[in-house]
Amino acid sequence: MPAIAGPSSSPQKHVVGSRSESIGGVRSAEVNTSRKRKLISDSAAEVSATVVLPVNSISTPMKWKSPRRCAVSIPKTSDEEIKEDSNEKLENPVISVCLEVKSKWNPKDDEQMKAVKEALHVSKAPSTVVCREDEQRRVFEFVKGCMEQKKAGSLYICGCPGTGKSLSMEKVRLQAEEWAKQAGLHCPETVSVNCTSLTKSTDIFSKILGNYESGKKANGSFSPLQQLQRLFSQKQQQSRSKMMLIIADEMDYLITRDRGVLHELFMLTTLPLSRCILIGTVFCVINVHFLKSVSYGQTSFKFKVRICPPGVANAIDLADRFLPKLKSLNCKPLVVTFRAYSKDQILRILQERLVALPFVAFQSNALEICARKVSAASGDMRKALCVCRSALEILEIEVRGSIDQEPKGPVPECQVVKMDHMIAALSKTFKSPIVDTIQSLPQHQQIIVCSAAKAFRGSKKDRTIAELNKLYLEICKSSMITPAGITEFSNMCTVLNDQGILKLSLARDDKLKRVSLRVDEADITFALKEIRFFRNCLL
């Protein structure tokens, strides 16, 4: 019978043989059988050798064997080997490949930890703006068209915080300068102003004038705005070939009561000889917050959601609300909307930042849950980077603690940022202020809050203080805690009312005051779930 693999090329076969030698009685009985039985047994042993071959080794179709023959030919596998094999199957294939290709990540190495933190820092500008190619192209085409035609124009960008507006504007500025050199045109004079740094909103005109006429003595008889208006209205301005690119970041800070500053800034682009290209970024968000509870397995946490509508209506109509004269002059600025990042976009940006590192510091499912929760909350990329850095710090504290306990112990395998680290970081970042308030309350006030949560689970929306006190006494009695008197109980309810947890109505008698719950029951459960006593009280 032809052999499946030769003795010298099949170490697995020798392993099988050595293991099967330990079964002494069975092996000796097998030697004393007939030649036919021996051939069958040998073929079974060869088939069993193919079973333990690696995936990349040569394999043949397996033959059916009876349970008795399997017990003889196949060696027993320990529980540890089965567990190890199952862990290898459950392991993420992407991380496995990366771990094989890249060097091993050691969280105890200060240099490696520093490199990961720098890669995830907000101040680190990536070489390319990922997931904002279309928006960046629209802005660049606008600037390019103005420079080719030597014509002024205005554009504003609206979007939620952390959607890449400022970073994209910096890339557009560099693109415009590079394109102007290639086209043989003068590079535009660029003025970048962060409006949050201005002492007064009118200071933006001084910034523009100082850059436009650097080295020239300012005319004290005219204001900076008047001097700019004269410069862009004089005939000799036609001989000036350079364009001026004004980038006003956080331009909504210029919105005053009379809207005069914002209006005059855009009006500079409508002057007959103006060569201003004005680009402004506008922060826009509807300030509505609510708490959303998310469960992952047996772990649940809450985070604050800030609504940023898909159309960003309060920014798109900025020209209609604050710049009505521009619309009448047919000079309405162009609008480019930067929408909040989606889950896939956040995940891609995180991977782009980490792929350059020579090691793997995050599990893929940990990055995925971070992207999912941040996109559901706000779509703020800066928040996602903050969460990842926080998860990395949690791992660092965990590793430092293990070093203190076992200074000479071996380094544990695969000490990367896992799901539990990321969930803890998300809970820390998006935790509601009311959760902190409930957690910092004294014990008896926390018992009152638990009593209120149980009292309002049904259809009844409010109860009297006497009814709430009855539930409070039941919890104290079952836990053998000395309860407070009715007067002290009423005073504690007043304190909870002042903190926005309970709502008390007015009544002549304290016992007749109506009590209702201002916070969500899920907030109370989330705040007190770590304490077994309160967890049992809320059942």
From Swiss-Prot:
Induction: Cell cycle regulated. Up-regulated at the G1/S phase transition and then decreases rapidly as cells progress into S-phase. Degraded in a proteasome-dependent manner in proliferating cells, but not in endoreduplicating cells. Residues 1-40 are annotated as: Disordered. It comes from the Eukaryota. Keywords: Cell cycle, Cell division, DNA replication, Nucleus. It is found in: Nucleus. GO terms for cellular component: nucleus. GO terms for molecular function: ATP hydrolysis activity. A motif (Nuclear localization signal) lies at residues 35-38. InterPro entries: AAA_22 (IPR049945), Cdc6/18 (IPR016314), Cdc6_C (IPR015163), Cdc6_ORC1-like_ATPase_lid (IPR054425), ORC1/CDC6 (IPR050311), P-loop_NTPase (IPR027417), WH-like_DNA-bd_sf (IPR036388), WH_DNA-bd_sf (IPR036390). Its main location: nucleus. Coiled coil: none annotated. Belongs to the CDC6/cdc18 family. PANTHER family: CELL DIVISION CONTROL PROTEIN 6 HOMOLOG, CELL DIVISION CONTROL PROTEIN 6-RELATED. May be involved in the initiation of DNA replication. May play a role in endoreduplication. Could act as one of the factors that contributes to maintain endoreduplication competence. This is Cell division control protein 6 homolog. The lineage of its organism: Eukaryota, Viridiplantae, Streptophyta, Embryophyta, Tracheophyta. The gene is CDC6.
